[in-house]
């Protein structure tokens, strides 16, 4: 009896056990994927590792790229290996992100559009597949938008999902804007000669070499200068040439044959001492026109007096000025010359630079900046052009004998000018420029010392900073543009100074990229190195000047010309009014009582 009951229960127990085990297996198969999904998103499930692109090797992809990325860091052509499918999928799945990154679209508008148009219709999928399956020759905006009019007739067109982001790839060629350098032309205009003996706005500096070394300045203006007291020492007329500040040239060059003055020689009772005139220290360079050569004889002092048309008898005031830096050698041999009759004398006139008054005898010569420091003698800074003496011949009633055959200041200046150049030994280029001021006009247009090629490029392929070849996201209208200036003549001197050359500079950019060897990585951002600008780099600067920490040179003479004084005063008044108004507006009143009822 008992055995029979056990025999009956055993099949039932076996069935229950089998069913329980089956249910446990079903629960395990359902619970394992859920538990794995709870740890995070598996990127391997979102890509197709067995796809066509993943099976292609690195060599095949590099061969499919139309540019040699081993020679250059980018390629602006897509080629057949560009992953259009991954780029389109990323743009389609991140419409809000792309619109916020590339346009002025509010985030709430993007969210509203995504919520309302979150429907995925089979028609959209078929239309998109048909659109991108057509050949490239039939792709056009007119062909792609031919069904839009039919869709507008639908009642639910307002909520109809339109994939405007999925547009055709829009290729834009690389800009070929080149910066060409033009040769500056030189135009010279000569002012008419001044014939009259009375000159306006041109002061005559009378250097009086008395034993006390004092100088007096006589300003000649339409009047008769009374005769000064006769002195045994010599006197020389020095005309100060003053260029025009209103001209548009970089430098003002005064022609040596446009200004003439008339002077009358006066007999000298005794021979004067030998005088060596040295220019003022503020001019920077040495006075090349008045230095006497050691191999030549000392110059002969001449005596001259300024004359003018007798129109009035009002005496002109004489003001004392700080004596110039002069040296007198007392031990030098004296020149015994007694002039009994009026003779024709020659006075050496020095060109004074860095003056701001107007002179009708100035000649405007616009030249290029590079030609100013050329080593040839034909340049503007050649010693012959800089310190060429202006000679003025005084005409008298009767000719007489010439001065002694000794060396003259003109001959000595020519010898010294031919031996010394613009830059002294051990002198920096910036120091010479600081001593020799350049009157830069505001309306001149400069050129780059290193010519560049300006480009705006949206590359498809590029090498990142680790040397990996990546595809950049470049789908219209979400291209990633890079603007750079490339040297047209790299490692060449061009317009740089000696010892310098043009070199390309680079800059890092962070761009969205795609790795064709790892589709599971998706779209990510990486660093890329692209050209930025072209600079002029010098290598012959001494180490002592490199090591010293100096503030940057800022000379106001190289800056833009200052504004008119009246305009500057008006601007100062406006600024004072504005400061006063803001101070009264923002500052609380002192008499305000916070405890007032």
Curated annotation (Swiss-Prot):
Coiled coil (residue ranges): 107-135
Protein name (record): Protein spaetzle 4
One annotated Gene Ontology cellular component of this protein: extracellular region
GO biological process: central nervous system formation; innate immune response
Alphabetized Pfam families for the sequence: Spaetzle
Region listing for Disordered, in residue ranges: 179-235, 289-340, 390-419
Alphabetical list of SUPFAM superfamilies matching this protein: Cystine-knot cytokines
Annotated Spaetzle domain residues: 448-538
S-S pairs: 450-502, 487-534, 496-536
Assembly and oligomerization: Homodimer; disulfide-linked.
Compositional bias ranges of the Polar residues kind: 206-223, 290-315, 325-335
Tagged with keyword Signal: yes
Keyword Coiled coil carried by entry: yes
Sorted UniProt keywords: Coiled coil, Disulfide bond, Glycoprotein, Immunity, Signal
Further information: 'Spaetzle' means 'noodles' in German.
Glycan attachment sites: 215, 287, 354, 463
Superkingdom of origin organism: Eukaryota
Entry-linked Gene3D superfamilies: Cystine-knot cytokines (2.10.90.10)
Range of residues in the leader sequence: 1-31
Bias kind Low complexity: ranges: 179-199, 391-419
Induction annotation: Transiently down-regulated by microbial infection.
Family matches, as InterPro entries: Cystine-knot_cytokine, Spaetzle, Spz/Toll_ligand-like
UniProt GO molecular function: growth factor activity; Toll binding
